């Protein structure tokens, strides 16, 4: 069977764990050459080794996604190493400061905005011109169902910063559509990642969150990776500007 991303080059941020790691592995399995980014060098090295052991091709660059220098460096590395850039999964994110909104610090709120929203813009700032020059490409952001179709108390910084990605998606999709660059966002429900376990650190909390979904469970990172693969591949060649719910029915479940 023909691999979906043969000949493509992809950047994946937030690749050290969770959805980002699963997506980088899947992209490589589907034939892409992958530039992986995150803060943690050890985890990135492990990921690259895993990809290469399976016959794939990847290179890592550790850094802070809120740095414009780092955003530019990831794109430059893709071009230097592989000569092109076709796909960017701007996935890095944090929960940010949680708690009653009047008690959230301005710095805590800004940290969430910087990591979840500004970093995505900075990535796209350098990815878009390359893709436009090549005649097309696909950019995917990781937003969330929280603050879109569902709300929780105590997560104002997270919800606001992730909701901003939907507006960014639509604006960039409109701006770069004529150059055949597609821009979409996925909106996961709860996914069994280190971030999820940090937010829900007891069996009772995890059972409560699972029950919010129509499927009565949370997703695996691999399930989300398959949705990202769809948006990255030519299977979605007429899809742009969307905020795609991949939430196990949380947006329709009221139980």
PLM feature spans:
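Conserved glycine-rich cofactor-binding loop
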Residues: 9, 16-17
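Active-site helix of classical SDR
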Residues: 124, 161, 169
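C-terminal helical subdomain
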Residues: 178, 185, 207-235, 239, ...
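Substrate-binding pocket helix/loop in short-chain dehydrogenase/reductase
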Residues: 99-101, 105-113, 209
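The beta1-alpha1 cofactor-binding region of Rossmann-like NAD(H)/NADP(H)-dependent oxidoreductases
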Residues: 42, 62-74, 106, 222-223
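Alpha-helical segment proximal to the catalytic Tyr-Lys
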Residues: 129, 148, 174-178, 237
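Short C-terminal tail/terminal secondary-structure segment
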Residues: 95-98, 229, 240-255
